Swiss-Prot record:
Top-level lineage group: Bacteria
Entry-linked PROSITE patterns: ACONITASE_1, ACONITASE_2
Annotated [4Fe-4S] cluster binding sites: 303, 363, 366
Matching Pfam families: Aconitase
A GO BP annotation: L-leucine biosynthetic process
Encoding gene per record: leuC
Subunit-level organization: Heterodimer of LeuC and LeuD.
Keyword Zinc-finger: no
Enzyme class, UniProt record, top EC level: lyase
GO molecular function: 3-isopropylmalate dehydratase activity; 4 iron, 4 sulfur cluster binding; metal ion binding
Protein name as annotated: 3-isopropylmalate dehydratase large subunit
Length: 429
């Protein structure tokens, strides 16, 4: 009888052709998908060309999404995108997404059905951990590893220890997946899951939409984790059936699998949470913020919170209201499809009427790229995932992190606050 394993151990063992892998083991495994963007792929291309192969291992298993500085913000980014475009054409890469059909990579891939439960996914972007929401093992790598994987279809891994998060209860009020992950990071710290797998289970999952789960898995890296992964349930399967025709495999953790820590969290007690500068662990609930923190800019979007559910919540709050005079509110639908759906539902009109500006899908200001860079002394509230020093612009600017509900309400108030201050009771649905 084989030894008990966690979800992550099982997926890694399966892809390495082994019956069992142990935390700390160094393994080579076959990957199902290799991902790169316009920032990381050019470096990978240079390394790939040094290998001396004349083709990629599988043109269907490589995905390249120019999303960080697109539409091209300057000559340098245009050159990088040109290099990536030419590489995709030369090697006939099936899943290269040009500006007209692109989106922020970590929202686009699940939407396109490119990741399914049981997959082993590597991406030259730290937020590749997002796909754990689908019950896949997905993790960020460097451009050199991307190059090697494009040539061989394999990558090396150190099997991580795991932390088990047993969620119970139901979301209440304006609490969302973003608040849950900010609460967890505030609890364990930015190195609380260092090189570990964050594995989510428990009856509380029923209360979490797929968009909530993508948000939670997305920010595993902000706790230092190797990956975040959710137990597959009916919601996962329903999502996969709607978006993909790929075969999938469900890996459930063994009952007696070993974890370095186990946390039980009652999500019904989690309140909307804000991360203060300059780390995602510097959290306070909205009730603990006693002073008025005035802001210059609100950003709603990103690979963390740019999905349709996020936009619906923001629109619900902004409908019939105006963004505070002198404040900038920028909204980024995460993909073209999400943008189109938001148009159909009238959300874009609500945003524009409220005084927001709506951008094409791009990572934009999240990494200090473009479309909303902060000046010296400016302060932003964003639904993004990082608030390090200088993350969104000038080293002397500040970024606070929140959910779309808090961000939208704050855009109206002019300071960090809750929809409750606008007389809106929480959504119990």
């Amino acid at each position: 009888m084989s030894k008990p394993m966690t979800m992550s151990q099982k997926i890694l063992a399966y892809h390495a052709g082994k019956e069992y892998v142990e935390p700390g083991d160094l393994i080579f495994a076959n990957v199902d998908l290799v991902l790169g963007n316009d920032v990381t792929t050019p470096v990978a291309i240079k390394e790939f060309e040094k290998i001396g192969v004349d083709k990629v291992f599988d043109k269907d298993k490589i995905t390249i999404v120019p999303d960080h500085f697109t539409p091209n913000k300057d000559i340098k980014s245009a050159q990088q995108c040109k290099m990536v475009r030419e590489f995709a054409k030369k090697y006939d890469i099936t899943n290269y997404f040009e500006v007209g059909e692109m989106g922020i990579e970590h929202a686009l891939l699940p939407e396109k059905g490119l990741v399914v439960p049981g997959d082993l996914v590597i991406g030259a972007d730290s937020h590749t951990c997002t796909y754990g929401a689908l019950g896949a093992f997905s993790t960020g790598i460097g451009s050199t590893d991307m190059a090697c994987a494009m040539a061989t279809g394999k990558c090396w891994f150190k099997v991580p220890e795991a932390i088990k998060f047993v969620l119970y209860g139901k979301k209440t009020g304006w609490t969302s997946g973003k608040d849950i992950i900010l609460h967890i990071i505030g609890m364990i710290g930015v190195d609380g899951a260092l090189y570990k797998s964050m594995e989510y289970t428990g009856e509380g999952l029923k209360s979490l939409s797929m968009d909530d789960r993508f948000t939670i898995a997305n920010m595993a890296i902000e706790a230092g984790a190797k990956n975040g992964i959710f137990e597959v349930d009916e919601k996962t399967i329903e999502y996969v059936k709607q978006h993909s025709t790929k075969p999938y495999k469900i890996f459930k953790a063994d009952e007696d699998a070993e974890y370095s820590e186990v946390y039980e969290i009652d999500i019904s007690k989690i309140r909307p949470t804000v991360a203060f500068p300059h780390l995602p662990e510097n959290t306070k609930t909205i009730d603990e913020i006693t002073e008025k923190i005035y802001i210059d800019q609100v950003v709603i979007g990103s690979c963390t919170n740019g999905r349709i559910e996020d936009l619906r919540i923001a629109a619900k709050i902004l409908k019939g209201r105006k963004v505070k005079k002198g404040l900038r509110c920028i909204i980024f639908p995460a993909t073209q499809n999400i943008y189109k759906q938001a148009l159909k539902e009238g959300l874009i009109e609500i945003f524009i009427d409220a005084g927001c500006v709506v951008s094409t899908p791009t990572c934009g200001p999240c990494l200090g790229g473009h479309m909303g860079i902060l000046a010296e002394g400016e302060r932003a509230l964003a639904t993004t995932n990082r608030n390090f020093v200088g993350r969104m612009g000038h080293p002397n600017s500040e970024v606070y992190l929140s959910s779309p509900a808090i961000a939208a309400a704050s855009a109206v108030l002019g300071y960090i606050g809750s929809p409750e201050e606008l007389g809106m009771k929480g959504d119990e649905e």
